Each structure stands twice: as C-alpha cells, then as structure tokens.
C-alpha cells in the first residue's frame, strides 16, 4: 500500500519500486489523500474539473505498472489537516487492504514550486 498526498507523488517517488513488486506478484493499492485539484497549471479549470483530470491521469499511470486499486480520499488539496477524521480514513483503508508494507513520502522532503 502506498499512501501519498497527491496524484503524481508516487510517480516521482516510488513507482519504479511498485512496478518491480507487482512484477514479482505483489498486489499494490494506492491511497491518495487529495486529488491534486489545486496542482494544475490551467487556472481556467474549476477544482472539480482539475480533480477529474488529475484522477484520470493517476489512473492511467497506475494502470501502466499494474496497480489495480486506487482510493481517493478527496481532501481539499493544499488544506489537508492531520486530524482524527483523516487518521480514521487511513486506518480504515489499511485494515481493509491489510498490506504487508505501507509506503509513504519522506516527511522531511520539501517541494519547491517552479511557479
């Protein structure tokens, strides 16, 4: 199971490892806290339109390596709060999927926007 904040975090982080694990027979599930609705260059799009695009892109990228399940929690991009509600959602997905390994992003890594 991979838990990340945004679509494309996995592709920039651990998709190669996930591809190898899937080729070796593992089942991988992605859990995305947001749908990346604020992280799109076309400012004419509504958040809902951006969300649909980002999710479609993530679905396509995951399909390339054989990921069969993606869970979108759809918290507002850029406004995620580490609260009890989020933790309950994450625990629910972990209990449901029962992964042997949970992969996440490095909490000390900082993304610097080029915009």
Task: Mark where each language-model region is.
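Active-site adenylate/phosphate-handling loop in enzymes that bind or generate adenylated species
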Residues: 93-115
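Active-site rim/loop-helix segments in enzyme catalytic domains that contact anionic ligands
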Residues: 1-98
